[in-house]
Amino acid sequence: HPRVRRLRQMCIRDRLIITGGPGTGKTTTINTIIKYFEEKGSEILLAAPTGRAAKRMTEATGHEAKTIHRLLELSGMPSDESTGVNFERNEDNPLEADVVIIDEMSMVDIFLMNSLLKAVVKPTRLILVGDADQLPSVGPGAVLKDIIKADVFNVVRLVKIFRQEEAGDIVTVSYTHLRAHET
């Protein structure tokens, strides 16, 4: 099936954005991606910008999600960057995983994104999920929108709105409603 092939193709990319408005299947797609990588025996890390978003991600996926700060291991050491924060996980001590999935990316500012990119080095896959049309983070930058415009990540836009409770098998729903567009 062509949609199944597209989903597999998107999962082999090392940098991917999944974007769509409310009800378009972002969480369903995350669950499908998790299942795909679990079947391959991959180590998967999940995170979101806030404790509340991480808790929702944990509930929706059945897998532990952390805040990005916790994932990157916020350090008590002072930082020489303008952010005033320092993380244990960085280019010298990268995250140890095959796949890192970050949800609610519209809430991430440029400083946190910079730290995240330093800690996720190839061959680790980085999958960013969020609604590019949401209001940007309270910190500087509209990171998700800017990355999409910069054309440095592959982008999947989920456009069809559906109700999850009407969905049968979660994988079937993702395959059916996924429209991949590389920008």
Give residue ranges: language-model regions.
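Single conserved hydrophobic/aromatic residue that forms the stacking wall/gate
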Residues: H1-I12, H177-E182
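Hydrophobic positions on the alpha1 helix immediately C-terminal to the Walker A/P-loop
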Residues: T29
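Conserved helicase motor core of P-loop NTPases
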Residues: D133-R179
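Hydrophobic anchor at the beta1->P-loop junction of P-loop NTPases
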Residues: I18
